[in-house]
Amino acid sequence: MQTAITKKWMKEWWILSLAALISFGKLSCPSVSNAYPIFAQQNYENPREATGRIVCANCHLAKKTVDLEAPQSVLPDTVFEAIVKIPYDTRIKQVLANGKKGGLNVGAVLILPEGFELAPPNRIPTELKNKLGKLSFQTYRPGEKNIIVVGPVPGKLYSEIIFPVLSPDPGTNKEAHFLKYPIYVGGNRGRGQIYPDGSKSNNTVYTASATGKIKRITRKEGKGGYEIIIEESSGGREAIDVVPPGPELIVSEGEFVKADQPLTNNPNVGGFGQGEVEIVLQDPRRIQGLLAFFASVVLAQIFLVLKKKQFEKVQLAEMNF
């Protein structure tokens, strides 16, 4: 009896220990999925605001270019490529969360018209699959197939991101129409400067919180960073500014600083950009009609030339007579 109780107690102890270990692991080792674009997905119902601004710009403050290439027109139920280009100098390094330097990641969001969606694997040609490599795509929201996000992925490998897109067929989808549609894109390279809760990352400028003389600068042990004590000019109080590891100090002890004056350099080397293109969902019957029209024009020209030659022969015969 005692042995059974002891075994049961040990089993429960192991289960509790394992649960505690898993919980601790989740807290101390956050998943990669907690990186962008999950921030936008968690905080914004739609990635594009009513003003046209894509919400990624709220965290990635620096402006950079991004290009989108897509066909001017597509036929219904057709797979085509939408290519997002995120150019940057791959030799540069960014400040990582631990303060060290590392390569830049890139990410993109593609906002397609209603009815357009990511092409299913069985519809993607082999050649296009080879171009995609190991890229993983996801929808911004469950059920919203027209908004696709990708990233973060290594910028050295994916400065160009290819989205395989499937156009809708108005014959089977009553919500789709043969019209001209806009496609919106947002793309970033590097880490953001602000987290969704409004706090700063270590990839931005840190400024003085008060006006006064820098009394002391202390380098923090362990993870790194600095603690800066400013003796305020008015009142003689002390303001403490904490700088995380990453940004480099550009001030020294004894220096007089004003409120909001930079204490560090700006370590950010990345940025965000957005753009748009237009695409026409083309009705095949219009193309057939256009081809028929061109054919009729060509035939008319041929008959006109033949008629002219016939007329010239008649005139020549009359002159000889």
UniProtKB/Swiss-Prot annotation:
Q: Which residues form a coiled coil?
A: none
Which UniProt keywords are given for this protein, alphabetically ordered?
Chloroplast, Electron transport, Heme, Iron, Membrane, Metal-binding, Photosynthesis, Plastid, Signal, Thylakoid, Transmembrane, Transmembrane helix, Transport
List, separated by semicolons, the cofactors it needs: heme
| GO CC aspect terms | chloroplast thylakoid membrane
Protein's UniProt keywords contain Plastid: yes
Which stretch is the leader sequence? 1-35
- Any one Pfam family here would be Apocytochr_F_C
Question: PANTHER family attached here?
Answer: CYTOCHROME F, PTHR33288
Which family does this protein fall into? Belongs to the cytochrome f family.
Q: What is this protein called?
A: Cytochrome f
- Native organism is Adiantum capillus-veneris (Maidenhair fern)
The root-end lineage is: Eukaryota, Viridiplantae, Streptophyta, Embryophyta, Tracheophyta
